[in-house]
Amino acid sequence: MTVRVRLGAGLARLSAAPLKTVQLAEGATVGDLFARLAEDEPELAPALRSVLPVVAGEHVTRDQPLADGQELALLLPVSGG
């Protein structure tokens, strides 16, 4: 299956492209996607530990199954004071 990944600003700086198309096996989860991204672009691996995956405006967990054609946004948490 194919999923599209949109990297938020903090992640986009670490990657060659802010929008990616990734091929995964049927039944793959958000965690499987993170593993593939870390394998393809090792510089993303540390940031992926704290990233917030969002599908259709809703935060999802790493065990969330993905569907063919789905688009995810990966956002870094914001902190401040």
Annotate the PLM regions.
Residues 1-80:
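Ubiquitin-like/PB1-type beta-grasp interaction modules and other compact soluble beta-rich domains
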